[in-house]
């Protein structure tokens, strides 16, 4: 898997974006071809699909965690399906406590704390496992652009700062698909990390299905210490902003590619950087789960989703799903 950082031209067009545009047109054509040839299957339970239109972190995992807690509180049985990014997974697997991030993906390890999780890279492979578990609801994390299965309820997650970047498809821009079609079809749209009352113009036609959401810390961290932050996630800037808003003194930071698999040498380098800054290492939960076997002493910031219209979410989820 090719892992890229989020380049500046994905947010603001420059000559590089325009030079890559012909490749984006090929990407668009292949996407249309794939969708036109696909014969979507019906999965053996109602499907809630959580996805986004662009590359990079938009808060999907936190939305899935929120949904899992919501369904559990209603005694609704569910299974989470995750895409196993950054793993060496060969076939669909039901995650158990002993699985590592390298085996099933960092998101799978985290989500397994909230309920039954199937990690897969091929959506069709989950059917036998779903039949064994017999859930009422299947929460699919990502796969929004996958045309090979029917979706009963879709949630599109949008980062309030990046929105849809420069408006170009991969690789000239961050888009997996142009947003209008996805937003029109969505049952709900989450505008994540939004602390502003003003709705971005591109989202004003969808105000009736728009939910403002914030990523907020859910654990206590000593604010008297110095911290050196690092992450290998899709939107590291939001993580660093969350740390500062939480009141931590961040003396430095280092960014790794999304879903990065850390080596012992990386850990040693990070400890060296922290020592230079007279600081303690702090990272995300997605990164922290990858260090289980490396005997580390790294602080982890846990986060959760806070939304402004929980009643709207409850009404739509339980009315349709």
Swiss-Prot record:
Binding-site residues for ATP, renumbered to this chain: 54-61
Role summary: Transfers the gamma-phosphate of ATP to the 4'-position of a tetraacyldisaccharide 1-phosphate intermediate (termed DS-1-P) to form tetraacyldisaccharide 1,4'-bis-phosphate (lipid IVA).
Organism expressing this protein natively: Rickettsia rickettsii (strain Sheila Smith)
Catalytic activity: a lipid A disaccharide + ATP = a lipid IVA + ADP + H(+)
A GO biological process held by the record: lipopolysaccharide core region biosynthetic process
Protein name in the entry: Tetraacyldisaccharide 4'-kinase
InterPro entries: LpxK, P-loop_NTPase
Keyword Nucleotide-binding annotated: yes
Record key words, sorted: ATP-binding, Kinase, Lipid A biosynthesis, Lipid biosynthesis, Lipid metabolism, Nucleotide-binding, Transferase
């Amino acid at each position: 898997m090719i892992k890229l950082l989020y380049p500046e031209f994905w947010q603001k067009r420059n000559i590089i974006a325009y030079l890559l545009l012909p490749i984006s047109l090929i990407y668009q054509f292949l996407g249309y071809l794939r969708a036109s040839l696909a014969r979507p299957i019906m999965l053996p339970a109602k499907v809630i699909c959580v996805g986004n239109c662009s590359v990079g972190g938009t808060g999907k995992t936190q939305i899935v965690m929120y949904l899992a807690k919501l369904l559990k509180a209603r005694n609704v049985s569910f299974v989470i399906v995750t895409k196993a990014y950054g793993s060496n997974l060969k076939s669909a697997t039901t995650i158990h406590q002993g699985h590592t991030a390298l085996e099933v993906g960092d998101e799978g390890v985290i989500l397994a704390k909230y309920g039954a999780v199937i990690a897969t890279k091929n959506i069709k492979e989950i059917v036998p496992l779903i039949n064994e578990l017999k859930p009422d609801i299947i929460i699919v994390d990502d796969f929004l652009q996958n045309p090979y299965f029917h979706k009963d309820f879709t949630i599109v997650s949008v980062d309030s700062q990046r929105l849809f970047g420069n408006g170009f498809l991969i690789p000239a821009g961050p888009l997996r698909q142009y947003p209008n079609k996805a937003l029109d079809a969505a049952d709900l749209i989450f505008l994540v990390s939004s602390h502003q009352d003003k709705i971005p113009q591109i989202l004003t036609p969808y105000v009736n299905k728009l939910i403002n959401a914030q990523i907020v810390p859910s654990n206590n961290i000593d604010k008297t210490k110095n911290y050196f932050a690092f992450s290998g996630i899709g939107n590291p800037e939001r993580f660093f902003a969350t740390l500062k808003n939480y009141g931590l003194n961040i003396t430095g930071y280092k960014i790794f590619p999304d879903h990065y698999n850390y080596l012992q040498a990386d850990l040693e380098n990070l400890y060296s950087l922290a020592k230079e800054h007279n600081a303690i290492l702090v990272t995300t939960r997605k990164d922290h789960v990858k260090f289980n076997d490396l005997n580390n002493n790294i602080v982890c910031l846990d986060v959760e989703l806070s939304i402004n219209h929980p009643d709207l979410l409850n009404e739509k989820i339980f009315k349709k799903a």
